[in-house]
Structure formats: structure tokens, C-alpha cells
Amino acid sequence: MNVSDNYRFDGNLEPGNRLLIYAYGHWVTLDNLLSFDFIEITVRGSRLSIPDLYSFIRHWRAGGSPRLKFLRLEFDHQLDFEHFEDELEVVERDIAGEYRSRDDHFQNWRFDHGYCIQRNDGVKTVIDFGGGHFVMMNWSEIQLK
């Protein structure tokens, strides 16, 4: 199924365990991401920007998306993450490990240079990013190397 470049989703999705958008994820906006209520989210073909990611992190830090344990965005373009960590208020860096989904085949993500950030209520997440991806994983759900 091909989704038009002009497509916009302004509805609400019911809360769920997993949201998979394997292709044509360009329609997912920051507002959509802020309203999703899922434990694990994967979006491929994302067109979100660095400022969008900062906004999502601020939302998460303030207690938003409380059920989210795993977020994976794969971009349809390269993002410049050169100074990205400068805005993160990093608690710990160069974390290596693996996230394993409770459904063994849903999402596994290995990382070697993760950044740990902390929410206002003390919950921690590890962020891994590069030109083509951005991943957030709940600290309690990862296995450290």
C-alpha cells in the first residue's frame, strides 16, 4: 500500500502494545507521536526533524508517553545529529547493550554508544541515534554488555 505524500492522520489510535509502520511512515507527525499510546513503536520512512525529536524528549521527560518502552524511527533522509547530545542532559554515555522485545521477534536493537537520559520522575531511557535512525529504550528493559 502506498500512502500519498499529502496524507495526514488527525484521528486517534486506541492504546495498544505495538505500533508498526513498516513503510510510508512519512505521515507520522510530532503531534501523532505525542498522542500515540503504545509500549513499542516502530516507524520507517519518518520525516520527523531534530527539533521534533527534542520536543518529543521534552514531552517524555515531563511524564508523557508513560507506557512507552521502545521507540524506533528510521528516517527517509539523513539527519545531522552532530550536536544532538548537547541538548539531552545526559546522565551516562557510551552505554552498550541490547533491547529485546517481550515478543522475541518483534524488536531487538543492539547498540554500542547509547546515551542515558532521565525523566523528571526518575525513569531512565537509553537513546541511540545515527544519520538514519533514532531509538529510545527503557533502561529497565535493556541488557547491558
Tell where the protein language model's regions lie, with residue ranges.
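Non-core capping and flanking segments associated with repeat-based/extracellular domains
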Residues: 1-145
